[in-house]
């Protein structure tokens, strides 16, 4: 039995100015004023009542927000201490949309959505947009360039021109486009046709006789290393987990794993790019939150920050809405526009289709921004229509810092490009540039090199350049005054590229596989370059003034170098850099005491270092469990042991025990802030023994604010049993009192 009692306290409660605004999705109401005892139910409701410098404290739960923060300086939004708060950008197709899936004749299931969606999740794992050649997220094959089809153009054959691409008939893991039988017209081609740049274009024509597709010309075009894949057409659905959304009819098509009924699955669709848009507000902070399939954008802010936050699937392209050739200024990514002194710290960004973070604006509009002690993984599996040189972390401004971070598994050709005079220190980066040709891990164009400081990084296991001072060849290169020191690079294709002049590269260690390029490339081309640079105290197996030729043919300029250990000059069949380090296989890169490296003072570490520096994040990243919503009560019929947030929809089986009756009386004591409960059980006999529970709920019927348990043991000859309890609530009501009774399982 249940009975409610009400209180008007929360409707009339006032929040003193300067105190936090509390939010509780389970027990709050946006009709209340946001005190600790009378919280709001949404963050948006709290923001509507907020003033500058307010703090919004959010209790555990799942929140679907779409809010603009305008002219609220100093606002902080954070999770309550110890609570898990997830900002969710998806809607459940079954629960939120109440939509029903149907089966098409070819076995593909479909559902009509009430609003647009462009990213599909099964059990909170992203499903693959239908594509050819096939690839998947589960095995990371989306980051394998062999899962792209190839074009036939080379520097010498002039096979086709911009706006056309001839398929090579099949290579790698798949056959050719003609063999597939697919009609590509109307699909979207993701085209890597400009080395470090890729574009999405609608396929407008298909000539099967010469296996050539046509599309609108791309902005940049190179005559080598062409690769592509197709998306955006129902015909491409051929493996389990693939989907396509028809934006004209709002119909979603999906090939369900193992021929299951999609109506029985936890399927969610992304419906918003941003949960929070911050405009005209300085010092806005988001702290200790999780974002799932949504993110944040800032415009015109100073001192805004994201701290102690995990973002999963924050960035997406618009191709899921069948939009190709996206404007790079309007990509749906975590972005700061015209912002300075911003901070991202102790945060994680995972699984994006697009860049991880973008800062837009020139030197006067975007400067002194910092990304520190943060983790980036599985960033950008399509690498199309992104800004700059198409990078993982982008900033177009000046004096920005990227420090103590960890990055691995990225698609874009360049990883870090953060504007003029960058500081890139204490990072560990590997497995980068997987889906484009050319590129570098730390990329500095000619005008960005002045006062750059690149130091104390580990960069390894990549086919891209490690640290590159880029620009035109020869005397036209005016890149100047970058400093690169105390870095360790291994298994890198051209670890350090020094191009320009007046640069300083010292105390770097480079070892192992050079992947066809010199470890340190100090370019002198067309009679110009690096006449005044200083290259000192480095340890590398190959240092020369050419990308791949040796020291004898391309020595460094006289007077620019000294105290280096250069394998071209000093090495032998038995001696290389790694042979003189303490334990490089276990990442101890200190030189062995009394080794030649030690005597020269060459390399990134000193032999006497007792606490050698280690780059990367200072904490251990553990991916959160999926933010599953369900019944949390283990006594309920629909208890979900995997759920972490309450759905408020537990189901209980009603058991009638003969002529058993009960009466519940719950009254507010007029002279005190407590409630008295009297429960009478009638027709109880001594032949049966029962257990009971009395509990109170406020908003969420699954959340027990207080409970009592006991046994009913009537005396022989009696058939009534009475329970009296008293409780003082910690929060104002209204409350509902519940009583459950069941047979003693031990009897």
Residue ranges and their predicted role:
Residues 64-76, 475-588:
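Predominantly extracellular beta-rich ligand-binding scaffolds that present long acidic/polar faces
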Residues 66-67, 293-298, 315-324, 330-332, ...:
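Short glycine/acidic-rich loop motifs that flank beta-strands on beta-rich extracellular proteins
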Residues 10-331, 335, 586-593, 598-624:
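Extracellular polysaccharide-degrading/modifying enzymes targeting complex plant/algal/animal polysaccharides
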Residues 723-731:
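Short, hydrophobic beta-strand segments
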Residues 653-677:
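Short, compositionally biased P/S/T/A/G/V-rich stretches that sit at domain boundaries
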Residues 52, 277-285, 302-305, 330-345, ...:
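Surface-exposed loop/turn motifs in large extracellular/passenger domains
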Residues 1-9, 623-655:
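Primarily marks secretory-pathway-exposed extracellular/lumenal segments that are disulfide-
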Residues 289, 309, 342, 347, ...:
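Consensus "Asn ladder" position of solenoid repeat domains
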């Amino acid at each position: 039995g249940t009975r409610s009692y009400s209180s008007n306290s929360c409707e009339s409660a006032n929040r003193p100015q300067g105190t936090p605004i509390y939010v509780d999705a389970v027990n709050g109401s946006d009709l209340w004023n946001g005190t600790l005892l009378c919280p709001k139910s949404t963050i948006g409701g709290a923001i509507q009542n907020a003033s500058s410098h307010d703090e919004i404290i959010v209790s555990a739960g799942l929140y679907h927000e779409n809010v603009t923060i305008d002219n609220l300086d100093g606002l902080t939004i954070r999770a309550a201490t110890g609570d898990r708060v997830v900002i969710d950008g998806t809607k459940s197709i079954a629960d939120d949309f109440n939509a029903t899936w149907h089966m098409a004749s070819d076995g593909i299931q479909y559902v009509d959505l009430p609003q647009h969606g462009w990213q599909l999740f099964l059990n909170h794992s992203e499903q693959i947009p239908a594509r050819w050649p096939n690839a998947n997220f589960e095995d990371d094959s989306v980051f394998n360039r062999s899962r792209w089809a190839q074009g036939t153009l080379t520097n010498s054959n002039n096979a086709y021109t911009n706006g056309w691409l001839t398929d090579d008939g099949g290579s790698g893991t798949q056959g050719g486009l003609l063999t597939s039988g697919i009609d590509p017209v109307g699909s979207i081609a993701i085209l890597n046709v400009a080395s470090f740049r890729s574009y999405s274009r609608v396929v407008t024509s298909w000539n099967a006789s010469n296996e050539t597709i046509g599309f609108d010309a791309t902005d940049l075009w190179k005559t080598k290393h062409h690769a592509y894949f197709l998306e955006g057409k129902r015909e491409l659905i051929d493996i389990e987990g693939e989907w396509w959304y028809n934006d004209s009819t709002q119909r979603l098509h999906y090939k369900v794993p193992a021929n299951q009924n999609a109506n029985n699955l936890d399927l969610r669709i992304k419906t918003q790019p941003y949960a929070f848009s911050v405009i005209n507000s300085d010092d806005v902070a988001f702290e200790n939150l999780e974002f799932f399939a949504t993110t944040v954008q800032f415009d015109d802010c100073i001192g805004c920050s994201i701290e102690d936050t995990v973002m999963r699937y924050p960035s997406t392209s618009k191709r899921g809405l069948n939009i190709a050739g996206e404007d790079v200024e309007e990509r749906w990514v975590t972005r700061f526009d015209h912002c300075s002194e911003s901070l991202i710290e102790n945060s994680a960004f995972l699984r994006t289709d697009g860049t991880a973070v973008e800062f837009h604006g020139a030197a006067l509009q975007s400067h002194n921004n910092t990304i520190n002690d943060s983790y980036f993984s599985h960033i950008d599996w399509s690498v199309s229509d992104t800004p700059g040189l198409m990078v993982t972390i982008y900033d177009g401004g000046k004096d920005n810092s990227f420090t103590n971070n960890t990055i691995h598994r990225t698609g874009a050709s360049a990883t870090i490009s953060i504007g003029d005079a960058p500081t890139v220190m204490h990072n560990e980066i590997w497995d980068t540039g997987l889906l484009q040709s050319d590129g570098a891990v730390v990329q500095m164009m000619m005008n960005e090199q002045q006062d750059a400081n690149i130091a104390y990084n580990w960069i390894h296991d990549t086919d891209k350049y490690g640290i590159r001072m880029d620009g035109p060849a020869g005397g036209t290169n005016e890149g100047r005054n970058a400093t690169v020191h105390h870095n360790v690079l291994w298994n890198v294709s051209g670890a350090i590229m020094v191009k320009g002049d007046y640069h300083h590269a010292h105390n770097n260690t480079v070892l192992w596989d050079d992947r066809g390029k010199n470890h340190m490339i100090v370019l002198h081309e067309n009679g110009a370059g690096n006449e005044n640079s200083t290259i000192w105290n480095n340890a590398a197996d190959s240092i020369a003034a050419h990308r791949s030729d040796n020291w004898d043919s391309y020595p460094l300029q006289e007077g620019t170098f000294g105290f280096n250990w250069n394998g071209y000059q000093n090495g032998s069949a038995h001696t290389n850099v790694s042979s003189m380090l303490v334990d490089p296989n276990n990442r101890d890169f200190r030189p062995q005491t009394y080794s030649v490296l030690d005597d020269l003072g060459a390399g990134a570490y000193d032999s006497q270092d007792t606490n050698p520096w280690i780059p990367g994040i200072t904490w251990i990243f553990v991916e959160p469990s999926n933010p599953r919503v369900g019944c949390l009560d283990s006594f309920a019929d629909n208890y979900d042991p995997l759920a972490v947030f309450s759905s408020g929809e537990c189901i209980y089986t009603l058991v009638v025990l003969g002529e058993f009756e009960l009466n519940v009386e719950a009254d507010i004591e007029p002279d005190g802030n407590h409630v008295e409960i009297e429960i009478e059980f009638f027709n109880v006999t001594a032949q049966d023994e029962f257990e009971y529970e009395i509990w109170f709920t406020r908003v969420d019927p699954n959340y027990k604010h207080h409970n009592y348990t006991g046994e009913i043991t009537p005396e022989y000859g009696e058939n009534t049993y009475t329970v009296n309890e008293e409780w003082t609530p910690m929060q104002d009501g209204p409350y509902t009192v519940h009583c459950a009774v069941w047979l003693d399982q031990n009897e």
